[in-house]
């Protein structure tokens, strides 16, 4: 049995949710209602996120990138955590509902591109269009956009020990099928509502300590 780690990006690897930061900085006021409808599960993630980015003009591309480079912060302990998983031959994947135009640059030099799964964006028209290269498989009907539970089924083996690390509603379906969940922020609320066992964390030092203990127990 091998251990596989599936980790969210926005609000998990980074301290802030980059999509929400973009919306607060660049989107018109109606983005707030869309955001609330996503969180209340009135809108599917795919539909809601598509609507949010359709509010952002594509001519802001360079300004958005510069804004994120200046404001996005990698969560404390992440660099050491990646070193730890590499040293212990633990498979690590970033499964992000975020967008290629900011996920790849912010993780450059940290995570190989082939271990990153995120959404794609099209800037060829007046407003940003989101493309969804990792949709739900036949086992999921939640219109996730990037379907994290489907990616776990695709990348993992039924005999593997699956760990999910996340912070929000977008991580809920993955958490439902994980063997162990590390949760913070809104994902804690959703785990408790759905009676999903979880370990809270604030830094990746917390996750590394727990994972080290898990390795000792399983070995």
From Swiss-Prot:
GO molecular function annotation: 2-hydroxy-3-keto-5-methylthiopentenyl-1-phosphate phosphatase activity
Name of the protein this chain belongs to: 2-hydroxy-3-keto-5-methylthiopentenyl-1-phosphate phosphatase
Classification via Gene3D superfamilies: 3.90.1470.20, HAD superfamily/HAD-like
One Pfam family from the record: HAD
Gene label: mtnX
NCBIfam families: DKMTPPase-SF (TIGR01489), HAD-SF-IB (TIGR01488), PRK09552.1 (NF007103), salvage_mtnX (TIGR03333)
Cysteine pairings via disulfide bonds: none
Keyword Magnesium set for record: no
InterPro entries given in the database record: HAD-like_hydrolase_phosphatase, HAD-like_sf, HAD-SF_hydro_IB_MtnX, HAD_hydro_PyrdxlP_Pase-like, HAD_sf
Catalytic activity, as annotated: 2-hydroxy-5-methylsulfanyl-3-oxopent-1-enyl phosphate + H2O = 1,2-dihydroxy-5-(methylsulfanyl)pent-1-en-3-one + phosphate
Keywords: Amino-acid biosynthesis, Hydrolase, Methionine biosynthesis
EC number: 3.1.3.87
One GO biological process term: L-methionine salvage from methylthioadenosine
Origin organism lineage: Bacteria, Bacillati, Bacillota, Bacilli, Bacillales
Organism: Bacillus thuringiensis subsp. konkukian (strain 97-27)
């Amino acid at each position: 049995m091998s251990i596989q780690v599936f980790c969210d990006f926005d609000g998990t690897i980074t301290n802030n949710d980059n999509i929400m930061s973009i919306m607060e900085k660049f989107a018109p006021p109606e983005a707030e209602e869309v955001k609330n409808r996503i969180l209340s599960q009135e809108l599917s993630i795919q539909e809601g996120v598509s609507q949010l980015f359709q509010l952002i003009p594509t001519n802001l591309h360079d300004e958005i990138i510069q804004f994120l480079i200046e404001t996005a912060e990698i969560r404390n302990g992440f660099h050491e955590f990646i070193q730890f998983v590499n040293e212990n031959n633990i498979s690590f994947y970033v499964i992000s509902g975020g967008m290629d135009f900011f996920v790849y640059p912010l993780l450059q030099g940290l995570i190989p591109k082939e271990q990153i799964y995120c959404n794609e964006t099209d800037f060829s028209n007046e407003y940003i269009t989101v493309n969804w290269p990792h949709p739900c498989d036949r086992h999921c009907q939640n219109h996730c956009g990037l379907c994290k539970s489907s990616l776990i089924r695709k990348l993992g083996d039924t005999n593997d020990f699956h760990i999910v690390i996340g912070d929000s509603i977008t991580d809920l379906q993955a958490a439902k099928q994980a063997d162990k969940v590390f949760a913070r922020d809104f994902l804690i609320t959703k785990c408790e509502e759905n009676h999903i066992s979880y370990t809270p964390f604030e830094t990746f030092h917390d996750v590394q300590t727990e994972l080290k203990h898990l390795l000792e127990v399983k070995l």
